[in-house]
Regions:
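Anionic-ligand binding patches
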Residues: 2-6, 13-192
């Protein structure tokens, strides 16, 4: 029987992404129970990821994996950063706010960053990794795939937005995939 690994999130889209990215790992992925509420009040992506994984693992008595990620824009001194998901009330308004704040700004350099943390059933941190993806913020959205800031984030090497990429292409560049790639060998050992 496969060991259970909780994904510390209530987002059904996230478990689908994790299923694909963690396909080499012999585990059964489940979303955290709806009854668990974790307040993300850390001062870094790493603190938030560790807190989510630790709380979910202790409350479920199972391993839990969590990530915290966001968009950091050079001209905005790293904003929205750890507040990326709370920068406005929905994706459309978040994009609108970014574009308004960057209006007339020539420096459009940005990067997505993700911290991924795994905690054991006692809430102890076992694995932690960071991944990043460099790009630029466009003047207007482009593409129909993805979510969040994907339509305005143009990846540096392909010159495509994440919203113009299919999931397989996005996975090869994504900050979350890069962070998970760093810990997959250890995850395989834990969930043998």
């Amino acid at each position: 029987m496969k060991k259970i690994l909780y994904v510390a999130s209530k987002n059904p889209g996230k478990i689908n992404e994790y299923k694909k990215l963690l396909s080499p790992v012999n585990c059964r992925l489940l979303l955290q129970p709806n009854s668990i509420e974790v307040i993300e009040n850390g001062m870094s992506f790493s603190e938030n990821a560790i807190k989510k994984a630790s709380e979910v693992s202790k409350l479920t008595n199972n391993y839990a994996i969590a990530d915290d990620s966001g968009l950091c824009i050079e001209a905005l001194n790293g904003r929205p950063g750890i507040y990326s998901s709370r920068y406005a009330d929905n994706d459309e308004n978040r994009i609108e706010r970014i574009l308004k704040e960057l209006k007339g700004e020539e420096n459009r350099k940005a990067f997505f960053i993700a911290n991924v943390s795994l905690c054991d059933p006692y809430g102890k941190l076992v694995l932690d990794a960071e991944g990043a993806c460099n790009g630029n913020i466009l003047n207007k959205p482009r593409g129909n795939n993805g979510f969040g800031y994907d339509p305005i984030f143009e990846e540096t090497t392909t010159r495509l937005t994440f919203a113009e990429m299919n999931q397989e292409e996005k996975d090869s560049f994504s900050h979350r995939a890069r962070a998970l790639d760093k810990i997959i060998p250890e995850l395989i050992k834990i969930f043998y």
